Amino acid sequence: MKNYSKNATYLITVLLFSFVTMLLIIPSKCEAVSNDMQPLEARTADLVQQPRYIIDVPPRCPPGSKFVHKRCRVIVP
């Protein structure tokens, strides 16, 4: 006679592992579907970066020089 308890234990282990795997995978799929069902404006609002306010301040030049054409130039008298 075959050992049916060993086969049953193996079958229960496989079924339990499959059930736990489904419990982990299905919620993530549902979340992805719910994100796709949002209006396009709501999804693109998350993707658009906020504009950065860049203030163009010229660098400080050493004494006796002047900032000309994006560089510090020494003024010759």
From Swiss-Prot:
Pfam families: Secapin. GO terms for molecular function: serine-type endopeptidase inhibitor activity. Expressed by the venom gland. The modification Proline amide is found at P77. Residues 1-32 form the signal peptide. Disulfide bonds join C61-C72. It comes from the Eukaryota. Keywords: Amidation, Antibiotic, Antimicrobial, Disulfide bond, Fungicide, Hemostasis impairing toxin, Immunity, Innate immunity, Protease inhibitor, Secreted, Serine protease inhibitor, Signal, Toxin. It is found in: Secreted. InterPro entries: Secapin. GO terms for cellular component: extracellular region. Residues 33-52 form a propeptide. One of its GO terms (biological process) is defense response to fungus. Belongs to the secapin family. Serine protease inhibitor which exhibits antifibrinolytic, antielastolytic and antimicrobial activities. Displays antimicrobial activity against bacteria and fungi. Likely functions in the innate immune response to microbial infection and possibly in the venom, as an antifibrinolytic agent. Induces hyperalgesia and edema mediated by leukotrienes when injected into mice. Does not induce hemolytic activity, mast cell degranulation, or chemotactic activity for polymorphonucleated leukocytes (PMNL). This is Secapin-2.
